[in-house]
């Protein structure tokens, strides 16, 4: 067969889309077309920040039906989403309550309990995963302690992409790359860790053994009656994005830039040394037995909140105004946990500057400048940490995802990090999702083969560092952890 048509359902924390890929195996050309885009936002339910899971499912099905109604024969479907959040099911496979968002404050104070009762080094030795206050391990502990009546109804817990696959196929699956984000998977066995799971109060029977990407979960029956295989892709959206990152060699790092920024490198081994623990480095699962050695950064979430609060709709105009301002007048630590979900983001940024005896950003452009400069400097700080961890410097940084369209931030990143930046592709998560589907369909050999297809079909933009830039001169002075409470500490 010359042509393959694969559908990627790509859900982010702020939006979702259903994308159709067309792959010509003879010429190795790959094109994407957006079929359906929809909003994903938090809602308050009984005092919790929850996801409107039924609305998301409705939009997924609508997007799939739109493809089928075009008369296109779909070869496969794959679903990727953000990590750590889950859906609870009862014995009949029906949903129990609404899934609570990782941004809800129910986990406040939970992580410190684990550090005392299990031990930080012991948790890291078992999982290899960074300490984030909203990891699934702490969410489940909050659930079982705060909502025992709800907990008593639970028979299964599915992570977000696995839930939507279940709704399409009727088959349950626990995909490995996303499962590792829970901080509950043992890094040596690739199975759920008994000690960590027992501490949460959740039952091991809620979970099946994690499966690596590339297996067929089951079939979705389209309106026309065709059975379409649903593939377990690398269902954590960052895992998919890394698959589509055209990393040139072992000296290349990646930055998946969106609501979250995730900076790291690909490795055949995990890094769980005392140095890695001190730097709060995570070893999330990747495709083909590779590890995504990385660190979470609070990313463009800060900007997204400012845009919403101040009703800014013309982002290109804002960036142009921002570029005209002097650099590094206002600096914050984007990973300060005060920015996870404040009531008023721009007021929180202003307060952080005021508390550190800096000028206070007032205008929209000044707030954006503060965010961009601070992110670029934090990128440089973390890239330095990663290089020290592996004992080799990086020579190139690949920025993928929606944030790679921000030319100003890309250049600031190149200047601060002091290395060449390659930006693109934008639709990295979708492409990585498609890549695993094509491998499952035996159209591609492996991840490296797929990256060659990506490089041949998608243009990258190069940014050369300017060592004389204002931000480059501030790198040595920027110490984000000195005056703030780190999100990942």
Swiss-Prot record:
The disulfide bridges present are 68-222, 353-370, 413-417
Q: Which amino acid positions bind substrate, per UniProt? A: 83, 236-238, 296
Q: Which pathway is recorded for this entry?
A: Carbohydrate degradation; L-rhamnose degradation; glycerone phosphate from L-rhamnose: step 2/3
- The highest taxon in the source lineage is Bacteria
User: Gene3D superfamilies annotated for this entry?
Assistant: 3.30.420.40
Reaction(s) catalysed by this chain, per the record, are: L-rhamnulose + ATP = L-rhamnulose 1-phosphate + ADP + H(+)
Q: Which GO terms describe its cellular component?
A: cytosol
Which residues are annotated as active site?
Answer: 237 (proton acceptor)
**What InterPro entries does UniProt report for this protein, alphabetically?**
ATPase_NBD (IPR043129), FGGY_C (IPR018485), FGGY_N (IPR018484), Rhamnulokinase (IPR013449)
Q: Which residues bind ATP?
A: 13-17, 259, 304, 402
Listed GO biological process terms: glycerol metabolic process; rhamnose catabolic process
Its needed co-factors are:
Mg(2+)
EC identifiers of the protein: 2.7.1.5
Family, according to the entry, reads as follows: Belongs to the rhamnulokinase family.
Q: What name does this protein carry? A: Rhamnulokinase
